[in-house]
UniProtKB/Swiss-Prot annotation:
Keywords: DNA damage, DNA repair. Residues 339-414 are annotated as: Disordered. Residues 388-402 have a biased composition (Low complexity). This is DNA mismatch repair protein MutL. The gene is mutL. It comes from Bacillus cytotoxicus (strain DSM 22905 / CIP 110041 / 391-98 / NVH 391-98). Pfam families: DNA_mis_repair (PF01119), HATPase_c_3 (PF13589), MutL_C (PF08676). GO terms for molecular function: ATP binding; ATP hydrolysis activity; ATP-dependent DNA damage sensor activity; mismatched DNA binding.
Amino acid sequence: MGKIRKLDEQLSNLIAAGEVVERPASVVKELVENSIDANSTSIEIHLEEAGLSKIRIIDNGDGIAEEDCIVAFERHATSKIKDENDLFRIRTLGFRGEALPSIASVSELELVTSTGDAPGTHLIIKGGEIIKQEKTASRKGTDITVQNLFFNTPARLKYMKTIHTELGNITDIVYRIAMSHPEVSLKLFHNTKKLLHTSGNGDVRQVLAAIYSIQVAKKLIPIEAESLDFTIRGYVTLPEVTRASRNYMSTIVNGRYVRNYVLMKAIQQGYHTLLPVGRYPIGFLSIEMDPMLVDVNVHPAKLEVRFSKEQELLQFIEQTLQDAFKKVQLIPDAGVTTKKKTKDESVQEQFHFEHTKPKEPSMPNIVLPTGMDEAQEEESAEKPSVAPQLWQQPKQEWQPPQSLVREEESWQSTSKPLIEEKAAHNEQEWDHHEEEFELEELDELQNIEEIEMNGNDLPPLYPIGQMHGTYIFAQNDKGLYMIDQHAAQERINYEYFRDKVGQVTQEVQELLVPYRIDLSLNEFLRVEEQLEELKKVGLFLEQFGHQSFIVRSHPIWFPKGKETEIIDEMMQQVVKLKKVDIKKLREEAAIMMSCKASIKANQYLTNDQIFALLEELRTTSNPYTCPHGRPIIIHHSTYELEKMFKRVM
């Protein structure tokens, strides 16, 4: 007898379940997506013990006809595609025909369904075997219950995490589905406790408010753009609202939530230097494209996709976000702590978005100082023409107490987040769900006006003083502004150096002692392949031995003391990417030089020097954050100040 044999259907389903049904969240995802494909407008999700004990999905969709009920639980049985051409034009969330048989093979499943024009069907399946099938009275739609998940695969059950972790995975996937389909009303219950309720009115901003809180919804910027191949819609938060994880960014492709690192990276690139290092925005982007441009048949879980025009899409996303930020005033407002409001007061105020039209400044015209000398060289870094004598003046004799001095190196984090999510993610406790949004509150979001769109210009600022040799105070008719002088000049210097090193030239700096690069054989061969490309960006390598190169000269724009670091970075790019990203290298060099050349904390300036600094800041393309993403300016509105002093109540 031969050794190779065909596996029976039951064992095949168990093997397939290993890919499709990894945990309770996988079951919820597959069943809810089936409900959406069935044109449901209302879906209820009931969980017990984070789905390990029981998962019940109730929808008002098209239902399943009696003759299709048994077939639906056979492998690769589906109503969503008919031939191979349909595989490349997929518009539905499901299409593989694997989910239902995989789920049924590792659980006790009960199905009640009806198309509305005939008696319903009641079906019970245990471990893939049909136990009972009968007609029953049922409303239109489907009610499917999955109990004792993984009862017959104890090895899989052993690897399940805690209740909180599994519940976190489920809520995360439900949140993403709610964002991708705001036209569907979703209710999520755990042990009879309601965790989420979306209205299903099609307003994704209401869904985001229900998930992340009203406060976050107030800080969202609408994103919308269209090209020949792509349409992008969504919301992203202002740069002042960030998180420590990428998990708060959601990308939707043709109505399907996907996990795609390059899309996340494109969103980050759209923010560019607006985000601090290691911080990420809260965002939701829905991308529509011809199904021929995206391959969703990559993995049974259908969370991964491939794009045929990936680079064009990434550039389009980056440019769309950058254009959106140019239309928005990005100076963060300082929060004001006030007395706790009554419930009625807070309900009235939490749905009011500030919207003020820009007014002409009422301050008198002030003649700024002119005729300043050219900047002097500080070490190897040439200074931009920003009131150069500011940065060379000796420090004053008086110094503030040491406890008040804040060295630049000590500021390693952005300001405290303005809000905390009501809807927790995996690592948070589920007590956050206790105070839930009522539907009436969410409906009021429809009338909320958009975030103030004043353009990307910094308003005129009139300095009134300096604190601790670090912060500049200025005012205009909108209130009080605090400016970090180091961050301000760092932004000015960065844009100067970025433009200075922006063009590829043949000017090179000869090295007194050649720099030797030792590589593995594989790395050596890859670099050797790209020698001509390296010459185009001004780096000339000579072979030195079997697996080494030497560098005798480098481009003149390399910052002093960082030459070997940039050369090593170029080698790593060639080895990993098989190309040199000169734009990224020059940007990093500009950041290095700008930080080194800028004034530090605890350096006192004259009024003329402060005026010059603020005027130069106004000429930059982004006067709101330093190249590392830290804020330059914080705003206290006149109204906030009056509230602090109880002039208004």
